[in-house]
Curated annotation (Swiss-Prot):
The gene is purC. GO terms for cellular component: cytosol. It comes from Rhodospirillum centenum (strain ATCC 51521 / SW). GO terms for molecular function: ATP binding; phosphoribosylaminoimidazolesuccinocarboxamide synthase activity. HAMAP family: SAICAR_synth. This is Phosphoribosylaminoimidazole-succinocarboxamide synthase. GO terms for biological process: 'de novo' IMP biosynthetic process; cobalamin biosynthetic process. Keywords: ATP-binding, Ligase, Nucleotide-binding, Purine biosynthesis. Pfam families: SAICAR_synt. Pathway: Purine metabolism; IMP biosynthesis via de novo pathway; 5-amino-1-(5-phospho-D-ribosyl)imidazole-4-carboxamide from 5-amino-1-(5-phospho-D-ribosyl)imidazole-4-carboxylate: step 1/2.
């Protein structure tokens, strides 16, 4: 196995130097974290499933003209992505009350919101990813007003498309978190969708039973986390070729 330069390691993924300039290899780990990494665990096969699910959803979004960093899947756990300058803001789109929203406003979980609500969080683990306003983002220079307009428009388009896609397979898109990056091409800069889209950063409930098929199973100790992720992949029609058995993590060369 060739040694690769590790660029960055996050809670659920590792970024390696890519084979050509302007690319990176995104490796999906089995590590699971919740509550800003206060709770940690390992879910065997999660990385494989998230790689496939994110590939599928990024490709689908690309087909409707949403620019993403995804280039192609390389193997069970890795995908080739475009190197972008990540904007340190998490964009959360909420359709149904869940998670921190229920605590902040005393709304019962599962309440359909009057309309989709968009929130921004500053990506900073030490500070616990605080919620911020558009004013904070532009005043502190994390993103320009035009960047923010683009991010909002893209996030709402992603929500519209994915809500319909998931509804078609019997899942309700309760809420999700996305990240964006700046891609520079010939002196031109554009905002594109980055990171991943998977049950790690989407809340997905079964339409009929309200069963949770996402990372809340880990957060809330509901059990059967891998099985829930497999169910999402199965409904999308993309279970890994080898089935859930072939999901052991390969040994990483340090």
């Amino acid at each position: 196995m060739t040694r690769r330069r590790r660029i960055y390691e996050g809670k659920a993924k590792i970024l390696f130097e890519g084979p050509e300039p302007g690319t990176l290899v995104q490796y999906f780990k089995d590590d699971a974290t919740a509550f800003n990494a206060q709770k940690k665990g390992v879910i065997t096969g999660k990385g494989v499933l998230n790689n496939r699910i994110s590939e599928y959803l990024m490709m689908k979004l690309g087909e409707i003209g949403i620019p993403t960093h995804f280039v192609r899947r390389l193997n069970m756990r890795e995908q080739l992505i475009r190197e972008v300058e990540i904007i340190p803001i998490e964009v959360v789109v909420r359709n149904v009350a869940a998670g921190s929203l229920t605590k902040r406003f005393g709304i019962p979980e599962g309440t359909q919101l009057p309309r989709s609500i968009v929130e921004y969080y500053f990506k900073n683990d030490e500070l616990g990813d605080p919620m911020v306003s558009e004013e904070h983002i532009t005043a502190f220079g994390w993103a320009a007003p035009q960047d923010l307009d683009d991010m909002l428009a893209l996030a709402l388009r992603v929500n519209d498309y994915l809500s319909g896609l998931f509804l078609g397979i019997g899942l309700r898109l309760v809420d999700f978190k996305v990240e964006f990056g700046r891609l520079w091409e010939n002196e031109e800069m554009r905002i594109i969708l980055a990171d991943e889209i998977s049950p790690d950063n989407c809340r997905l409930w079964d339409v009929k039973t309200n069963e949770k098929l996402d990372k809340d199973r880990f957060r809330q100790d509901l059990g059967n986390v891998a099985e829930a992720y497999q169910e999402v992949a199965k409904r999308l029609g993309i279970m890994p070729e080898a089935g859930p058995g072939d999901m052991k993590a390969p040994k990483l060369v340090q």
